[in-house]
A protein has these predicted regions:
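An N-cap/entry alpha-helix motif that binds or orients negatively charged groups
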Residues: 2-84, 190-252
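Generic secondary-structure signature for well-ordered alpha-helical cores
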Residues: 32, 48, 58-65, 119, ...
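Hydrophobic faces of well-ordered beta-strands that scaffold small-molecule active sites
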Residues: 91-94, 119-123, 142-146, 170, ...
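Glycine-rich active-site/cofactor-binding loop and its immediate structural neighborhood
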Residues: 87-126
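A gly/proline- and charged-residue-enriched helix-loop-helix capping module
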Residues: 116-137, 141-155
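Domain-wide signal for the mature, well-folded portions of proteins, strongly enriched
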Residues: 23-27, 93, 267-268, 286
């Protein structure tokens, strides 16, 4: 249990800093100061030379806004509908794995914030809080992201768990046929198994609030959705990540995705689309939506940015 005074101090610091964040770059700079460097680089970094990461951002500057004036803007309604669900903002939180690396409340905090904003929260298979734990705190619409695993029974188990706690839609991620070569992680030692450098350990001491909250929580860091697949006495995150890495199937084809659509029988999106041809294939197998994505540049460098694909 984290002492109350540490929690209050951490929240006060966060509130003070967030009030001074006015754009995404401010948030990025604040995160860099607030969490240890290995965790920040894991979150902020991308594959190889990070060409795709930079392209994802810079390509937005290639496009102009063409406003139309002398129209009634007395009442603005940004709400919309996506895969049959009404949301208050045309923004959806994408799935992010291992969120407790960045904040001890991880997916619990992010999903609650999404619900407060009236939009969708997408939970990753690699989450540090489980499907059920997130459902308990997230009153808003929920989607679950997964991959095509070698163990098809594991996929069906996820389907049943999601149905039981009313996840509305599934997201199939297809752009991770092999792990990405993220050089920042190699430098810091954020690998499987971890090989943290001396500089990385020193950085933990330079971020005492983050370190204290993590240590004093006494909560094991694990991939909660698959924790039951490891021996009871060996459920650390390294064991579970190694288990999941063995589950990734490089032989996956569109027929496997079609099988998942048929088994789920509900709203289904395919994430990682990077070509018109694959978007058409996704529609052909019965997907309700496609998500243009290059995984934030984390898997394949020199890929096209999603906005340029539009």
């Amino acid at each position: 249990m984290v002492p109350a005074f540490i929690t209050r101090l951490d929240e006060a610091v966060a509130h003070y800093c967030l009030k001074r964040c006015h754009n995404i770059r401010d948030l990025q700079r604040y995160a860099k100061r607030r969490i240890p460097r290995p965790m920040f680089d894991y979150m902020d970094g991308a594959a190889d030379d990070e060409v795709t990461l930079n392209r994802n951002q810079s390509d937005f500057n290639r496009y102009d806004l063409l406003p139309r004036y002398l129209v009634d803007v007395g009442e603005i309604d940004p709400s919309t509908e996506i895969m049959g669900q009404h949301i208050e903002l045309p923004i959806v939180l994408a799935p992010t794995g291992m969120s407790r690396l960045f904040n001890n409340d991880g997916e619990i905090a992010a999903s609650a914030a999404a619900a407060d904003a009236g939009t969708v929260y997408s939970l990753s298979t690699l989450s540090t809080y489980s499907i059920e734990e997130v459902a308990e705190v997230c009153s808003g619409p929920k989607w679950f992201q997964l991959y095509v695993f070698r163990d098809r029974d594991l996929i069906l188990e996820f389907f049943e768990r999601c149905r039981a706690v009313k996840y509305h839609a599934l997201i199939l991620t297809i752009d991770v046929p092999v792990p990405g070569n993220r050089e920042r992680d190699l430098y810091s030692g954020m690998t499987i198994p971890p090989q943290l450098s001396l500089a990385s350990y020193l950085d933990f001491f330079l971020h005492p609030l983050w370190s204290l909250k993590y240590v004093l929580s006494r909560q094991p860091f694990q991939l909660s959705n698959v924790a039951h697949k490891a021996p009871v006495d060996d459920r650390d995150v390294t064991t579970l990540v190694e288990y999941l890495q063995k589950q990734f199937d490089p032989t996956v084809k569109w027929d496997d995705a079609a099988w998942m659509v048929e088994q789920w029988q509900g709203p289904f999106a395919v994430k990682g689309i990077a070509s018109v041809e694959d978007a058409v294939r996704a529609a052909d197998i019965g997907a309700n939506a496609v998500i243009l994505s290059n995984h934030g540049g984390r898997q394949l460098d020199s890929a096209a940015s999603p906005i340029s694909l539009l």
